[in-house]
């Protein structure tokens, strides 16, 4: 645990980048972008999901497991040196090789002294056309976590986790003042004309809602560029648009949709107190009535009824 008093304000850097086919080049670019963000004043820098490679989960190919690395490993060591040199906290998403045949989509948290604070393993793993992640990644088994760093207590989740309010809530309830979502998301080119705007809006809206519901900052950090797994495939056009939302859900900084960018913006912890005083959602939660959330689906009426507060409980709240 970091014993220093966290700052009341600091600057965050969101690194949006296109990935080349060369993992070593991508790592060099990431290190340079960390330095660029730090030079612009950032004290916390987040990289995109699986930044070391192009998005390989567009196809199922066992040879691509060779892209994985241990933690600690080459990526965390290089970024640890960069973090220490620049004095910044770094979120480093990696394809983690945990053991032979066991892999995770993970995010390492590196403190400003270069030390590895901890690791988050992606909890929600998709299996959709061109997002065949279940072939590669075991679901996370570390739970939703927070990390004490030089900039205070932060939480990181990964990409598909951003669609689930439960993960955001459980992370915020542990005291995180910011939720970071390193991401790899984009359009199927054939759908862009008809659904593209709605898909991008939904992606931003769900994460803004996490900021509002929990009274925290939310940062989504995406890759950019059109990646094809082979010469004939349509591939994915990653939509960039990395952004920071404040505790009121306002988008206060955003990257373009079509190019690399390092976006920096102030995080002010006083805004959290301001938001939660005006919108006391944490105060008004009915934790006695949410048992049904631990079930896959409430198929039977008696099960649903059993999760309602009793008359005695209701009377005690008056």
Question: At which residue positions do the language-model features occur?
Answer:
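Short, basic, low-complexity termini and linkers enriched in Ser/Thr/Gly/Pro
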Residues: 1-4, 301-318
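Short, glycine-anchored, charge-dense loop/turn motifs used at functional sites
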Residues: 12, 109-117, 243-252
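CN hydrolase (nitrilase-like) catalytic-core segments centered on the catalytic cysteine
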Residues: 68-91, 159-262
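Residue-level detector of high-confidence beta-strand sites
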Residues: 106, 119-122, 241, 254, ...
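A short, polar/charged loop-to-alpha-helix boundary motif
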Residues: 122-136, 259-276
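Cysteine/selenocysteine-centered motifs that mediate thiol-based redox chemistry or coordinate metal-sulfur cofactors
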Residues: 144-177, 183, 272-303
């Amino acid at each position: 645990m970091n014993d220093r008093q966290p700052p009341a304000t600091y600057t965050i850097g969101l690194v949006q980048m296109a990935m080349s086919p060369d993992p070593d080049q991508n790592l060099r670019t990431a290190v340079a972008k960390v330095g660029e963000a730090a030079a612009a004043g950032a004290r916390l820098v987040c990289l995109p999901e699986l930044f070391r490679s192009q998005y390989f989960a567009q196809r199922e190919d066992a040879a691509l497991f060779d892209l994985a690395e241990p933690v600690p490993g080459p990526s965390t060591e290089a970024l640890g040196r960069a973090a220490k040199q620049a004095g910044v906290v770094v979120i480093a998403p990696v394809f983690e090789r945990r053991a032979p045949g066991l892999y995770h989509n993970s995010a390492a948290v590196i403190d400003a002294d270069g030390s590895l604070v901890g690791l988050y393993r992606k909890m929600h793993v998709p299996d959709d056309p061109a997002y065949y992640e279940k072939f590669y990644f075991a679901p996370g088994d570390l739970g939703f976590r927070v990390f004490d760093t030089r900039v205070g207590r932060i939480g990181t989740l990964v990409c598909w986790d951003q669609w689930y309010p439960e993960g955001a809530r459980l992370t915020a309830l542990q005291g995180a003042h910011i939720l970071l979502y390193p991401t790899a998301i984009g359009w199927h080119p054939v759908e862009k004309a008809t659904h593209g705007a709605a898909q991008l809006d939904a992606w931003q809206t769900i994460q803004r809602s996490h900021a509002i519901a929990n009274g925290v900052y939310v940062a989504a950090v995406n890759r950019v560029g059109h990646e094809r797994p082979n010469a004939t495939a349509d591939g994915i056009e990653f939509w960039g648009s990395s952004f920071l939302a404040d505790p009121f859900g306002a988008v206060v900084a955003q990257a373009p949709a079509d190019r690399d960018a390092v976006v920096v913006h102030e995080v002010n912890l006083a805004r959290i107190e301001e938001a939660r005083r005006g919108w006391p959602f944490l105060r008004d939660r009915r934790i006695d009535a949410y048992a049904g959330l631990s079930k896959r689906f409430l198929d039977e009426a008696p099960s649903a009824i059993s999760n309602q507060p009793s008359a005695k409980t209701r009377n005690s709240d008056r």
